[in-house]
Amino acid sequence: QAVEVVVSRLSHAGNVQKSQSPRVQANGGNADTNGKKNDELAEYLEPNLMMNNADAKLIELARDAAGGEREPYALGDRLRRFVTDYVTTKNLNVGFATASEVARTREGDCSEHGVLLAALGRLNGLPSRVAVGIAYVPVFGGQDDIFGYHLWTQFYIDGRWVDFDAALRESDCSPIRITFAVSSLKNS
């Protein structure tokens, strides 16, 4: 059964493209998703309440963050590094902010880092979702050696979901995380 999806994303030239088709181009326009049908990945490229890919500020950030990179893993790493540096006020005072809100306030905790990173990935053609679980941190909130609740981003690259954690500054992350659930943050 064909599913029609409208996706806005940045072209490699930095222009906004809208596509409307039963299949969605994944990995920056490369249709090779190693056995996963593009329509199975459509949900991870679509906009939603948390990731408005028509937002001019997000489009600008996605273009700047990508810097012309096309190779999916290198692109994911560039985006992760960008978000790590872009969110300048690291705190727990923000609720679960949308990517558009984070783009403007530049503040938040792991959830804001994760949502912004997923949005920038989608705008650059990387299927993106968030993972929720716990992560080991050596020091947090005055405590040493703890596992704390955490949220990070996953990009679908070369036939698998790869962890990218802008809050903890890691790409293709070390095994300090335990995933409880994953989500596209699709509207309910």
Regions found by a protein language model. Give the residues of each.
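Generic structural hydrophobic/aromatic packing signal, biased to beta-strands
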Residues: Q1, V5-V7, A62, V130, ...
